[in-house]
Amino acid sequence: MNFDKREERLGTQSVKWDKTGELFGVTDALPMWVADMDFRAPEAITEALKERLDHGIFGYTTPDQKTKDAVCGWMQNRHGWKVNPESITFSPGVVTALSMAVQAFTEPGDQVVVQPPVYTPFYHMVEKNGRHILHNPLLEKDGAYAIDFEDLETKLSDPSVTLFILCNPHNPSGRSWSREDLLKLGELCLEHGVTVVSDEIHSDLMLYGHKHTPFASLSDDFADISVTCAAPSKTFNIAGLQASAIIIPDRLKRAKFSASLQRNGLGGLNAFAVTAIEAAYSKGGPWLDELITYIEKNMNEAEAFLSTELPKVKMMKPDASYLIWLDFSAYGLSDAELQQRMLKKGKVILEPGTKYGPGGEGFMRLNAGCSLATLQDGLRRIKAALS
């Protein structure tokens, strides 16, 4: 795969490239914000989709045992996690699954714990369903985030807390939570009867030899209180095909989740999503290995550029994913000023840190899922914005 090739995405109804005027008021800025990559999907996926297209019939379609076997094989081979096929259900996306989980495992007025700064839809899916957010803010230690377990225990002990949403690896920072962290977290949730929804959508994109630990893999007790959200969308750049696998080992919890899907008129996956998830998880490994090597090269380039050209910008080097969490607070700019500098002076679009809740002030998220040349262009634009 030639990851250096710069693919043209303008005019393809791309949110990242074609909505910049509507969303940011600029049309001449380089988009490095929303979390999809500028790479073509693996040939294994595109060829499978062509074959499905050539069949020419697109009636009602449902994932079957073959689809579940592909998910199980992937989890076993990539993460050492033996998943029971019966525990798998499917959703059009992880955000949809978050909403379904909130409806299934909480009541209106309940509190849901999240760890800011964190992925924006966590807030939306809780609040739009009439539940309340309770923050367990992450601590910054030695250039990375850490969990405040003392505060977490206090929050989980509140009887109105019924759900905890974990982001592992963490978005926006790329922090991969350690086995020890997950064990402590899981024991607290068990003790207080709190269900854990673990968003593990970035878990296939582990960098620099880091290994992902699925929360539900740690014990049967943890599995029984867990809902794991996985998907090939970030891994293989197929978010537009809308396919995710939701792993719920406990039968009663799985039934509640399925009832939420049905109540909202959501059934199965579309025909191309089924084909894509099977091809991705059964044939996508070699392509992913190449991608990870390339993303590591991009991360190293960003780190080197920032250290020499913009030493006041602090980069949280990620354990996983193609996203970079950048701290611009040393410049003393307000978040609005920082955003306007990027848009108007630098002509580059980053994701504002304030979108991720408390603790995101002064930060912006950079998407390095692009060619090295595009990344270098973006870094030069950031420098221009701050000059």
From Swiss-Prot:
Tell me if Lyase is a UniProt keyword of this record.
yes
Q: What pathway does the annotation place this protein in?
A: Amino-acid biosynthesis; L-methionine biosynthesis via de novo pathway; L-homocysteine from L-cystathionine: step 1/1
Q: Which InterPro entries match?
A: Aminotransferase_I/II_large, C-S_lyase_PatB-like, Class-II_PLP-Dep_Aminotrans, PyrdxlP-dep_Trfase, PyrdxlP-dep_Trfase_major, PyrdxlP-dep_Trfase_small
Knockout phenotype, as recorded, reads: No visible phenotype.
Kindly list the GO molecular function terms attached to this UniProt entry: cysteine-S-conjugate beta-lyase activity; pyridoxal phosphate binding
Q: What induces it?
A: Constitutively expressed at a low level.
Question: Can you cite a GO biological process for this protein?
Answer: methionine biosynthetic process
Q: Which E.C. number(s) belong to this protein?
A: 4.4.1.13
Per its UniProt record, the required cofactor names are: pyridoxal 5'-phosphate
N6-(pyridoxal phosphate)lysine: modified positions: K234
Entry annotated with the keyword Repeat: no
- Keyword annotations of the record: Amino-acid biosynthesis, Lyase, Methionine biosynthesis, Pyridoxal phosphate
Give the catalysed reaction(s), semicolon-separated.
L,L-cystathionine + H2O = L-homocysteine + pyruvate + NH4(+); an S-substituted L-cysteine + H2O = a thiol + pyruvate + NH4(+)
Question: Family, per the entry?
Answer: Belongs to the class-II pyridoxal-phosphate-dependent aminotransferase family. MalY/PatB cystathionine beta-lyase subfamily.
| Function according to Swiss-Prot or TrEMBL | Catalyzes the transformation of cystathionine to homocysteine. Also exhibits cysteine desulfhydrase activity in vitro, producing sulfide from cysteine.
Q: What is this protein called?
A: Cystathionine beta-lyase PatB
Q: What is the lineage of its organism?
A: Bacteria, Bacillati, Bacillota, Bacilli, Bacillales
